[in-house]
Amino acid sequence: IKGYSESEAYKAIYQGGLTIKSTQNLQIQKICDEEVADKANYDAGTKYSFYLSFQVKEKDGTIKTYTNQTMLSYYKKKNKSQNYSINFTSEEDCRAAIAQYEKDVLGKGDKLVENSEYIFITMQPQVAMTIMDQSTGEVRAIVGGRGNKAGNRTWNRATKTCRQPGSTFKIIACYAPALDAGGKTLASVQDDAPFTVGNKTYNNYSHTFGGFTSIRKAITKSINIVTVKTLQDIGVDLGYEYAENFGFSTLTDTDRNLGISLGGLTQGVTNLELTAAYAAIANQGEYNEPSFYTQVLDHDGNVLLDKTQTKEQRQVIKEDTAWLLTDAMKDVMTSGTGMRAYFGTGMAQAGKSGTTTLNRDALFAGFTPYYTCVVWGGYDDNSIQSATGYPKNLWKVVMKRIHADLKAKDFEKPSGITQAVVCAKSGLLPEADVCDKDPRGTQSYTEYFAEGTVPTENCDHHISLQICEASGKVAGEYCPADQVVTKTYIVGAEKGSADYQYCATEKFLNGTCNIHAVSYTHLRAHETVL
């Protein structure tokens, strides 16, 4: 603060003398606090963990410090298992476990140092939540954890804790750059099939493979294979650069790999920065630095700091790109992995779910035309979770309440957005009487495009063949006309995908009917000679 030393500014802020105009909305904060505290919003119930510290004076006078971390290490080693956890069903069980640990580490002649024991019991799983007005970057509410606070200015999981963002990062590091600068559209397809790069094999959460799949569907259903292949196409460096530009300060060069598209990061990200990134998409592609105050005034009313004049703003993706991503994420809410978070009421909602390996982290990131909200949930010690739906529960109940008195509206469509009919299996223009004759039903559908990106080529993943019903093979020149039918096949599908059973393989294409190998006239003439 201008004119203040660091110590003077600290005292003025926390002990009086300065007026801080906060961006917090007390009503929204109250709603967040109430819903985070409501145990009914947590699927698997509540457990309890703790922060522990105590000192032991050993027989020879040496002082040793023990913590919850040393406790974890001690029992994992003692039990020869990595599954030991300090998450218990009650506070009483926590205290009993601590007492047993103290007993186990105290040797003969050792003593617990008086007044050295510190125990703080906390609920698990923990959560972090941030609600931001995307048009300004102003934080309206923030929750740094659940349970009673140990004191003022304690650890805030929303601003200080870095955790893996999981599939919420697919939008940030893959699909935003793919649509914005990678030459992709929502209709662009990848073959969702078994996929290995080097010694790394990628899989989908469902362990199934859908074949040729559009980016829109991959966002809606959170399909990993399509995401990784898309980033491979556009280049890891492009994905990394876009993620950085979205405001993430914890990325490192070790994150320059395909894993960034799935949210597999070296350090992870904070809930606050993830909220700001999604807020940029909600704000027509313009990033606003998160702010907790607008102005700081001295006791005479003089403006010492004016955040509205100094906050960082930049366009991170085109307005058209932001709208296209938003439209795909609307599908997430109504027919995809985010249906549980959808609160209805006619208010437009867009979002993306996320989980990490063994469900250690669960997230939901989403927005309306008014607010952006991101919820993270997980155990402080990174334990495996048995349920991951509660971030969606929290997002739904909080966002429904804070929008109760707001006018329902949709996201405004930019003038540069157009529509075109394409084939779902190629992302290209459909071939007449081919793509709509797919054995599973028509594959033609209407998609949105940024101006200038509508495909001009025809589908290259469907083919129409004349098939002999007698042999089931490609009809030859001697097959009777009344036994020949026209069928549509997929071409280029990989083995193991849902498309493969409808695929005309190279072997199939190169083989023709072996029943009608010669003409009927030639056969009758041969019989007459005999």
Set out the residue ranges of the language-model regions.
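Mid-domain, small-residue-enriched loop/turn segments at the edges of structured enzyme/sensor domains
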Residues: 201-204, 235-276
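Conserved small/polar residues in nucleotide/adenosyl-binding loops
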Residues: 218, 521-528
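Low-complexity, Gly/Ser/Thr/Pro-rich intrinsically disordered linker/tail segments
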Residues: 426-524
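Active/ligand-binding-proximal structured segments within catalytic/core domains
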Residues: 152-178
